[in-house]
Each structure stands twice: as C-alpha cells, then as structure tokens.
Amino acid sequence: MSKKITDVVNIATSAAEIERYPTPEDRLVKGNPEQNNTLHFSTDDRFFVGEWGAEVGCWKVSYTENEYFHVLSGKSILRDTEGNELIVVAGDKICVPAGFEGEWEVIEPTQKIYAIYEN
C-alpha cells in the first residue's frame, strides 16, 4: 500500500507525548536520574524514532538493538565492560551495535534524537 504525506512525521512538530520515568533500581550505578522518552515513529515493534533525555547519574546498559543517535545537548560517557570510554557531546552522531554492554553515565543533562532497529 502506498503511503501519503499524512504518514510523514515531522519530529519538530510532532504531538507525541513525553514519557518520564525513573531509572530502574536494578540498573543504577550512581544517582537516581529521571529519564524521558518521546516516541515519534514506529510502524512495528522493530523500528523506532524518538527523543530521549536523562538527568545526571549512571546506569548499566545492555543493547539488544542497533541504535543511531544524535546528541542535541549535554555530555555523557558511554563505557564498555572493560572500562573503555566514549565521551559524547552535543553534535555527536553515534552508532551503537546490538550486543553492546556497559554503562551510560550522564555528566550534564543530556538530550538525543535516536533511531533504533531491534533485531
């Protein structure tokens, strides 16, 4: 079936609602950061586009999905299980492969736009 212009999503003007939630206790490393997510687009349970943000803190991550993200603001550290770090700041464009495990540490409140493909 052919899609129409009404199926196109402009993220800047999307009416999607912001979901705010605490970081799950079993993943916390330090702090108690609130996270937020706005899902702008998903046609199935495999591909998602949205905006995400978090306050200062650190938690464990385990990616089952491939993710591309563009940092809009803030500063965070993505750390693998061996302690290797990648500092991400506004303007960075990052791809994280499914299977990545480690920690996400927010140094300054961070906001990103993302596209996720769940394997």
Regions found by a protein language model. Give the residues of each.
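Ligand-binding loop in jelly-roll beta-barrel domains
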Residues: 98-119
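Well-ordered beta-strand positions in beta-sheet-rich domains
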Residues: 51, 60, 85-87, 101-103, ...
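Conserved short histidine dyad/triad with adjacent acidic residue
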Residues: 45-63, 97-98
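Short hydrophobic/aromatic-rich beta-strand segments that constitute the beta-sheet cores
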Residues: 61, 78, 112-114
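Short, surface-exposed charged micro-motifs
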Residues: 39, 68, 103
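Short acidic-glycine-tyrosine-enriched beta hairpin
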Residues: 82-98
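A short, N-terminal "cap"/entry segment at the start of jelly-roll beta-barrel domains
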Residues: 1-46
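Short, conserved beta-strand element in jelly-roll/cupin
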Residues: 63-78
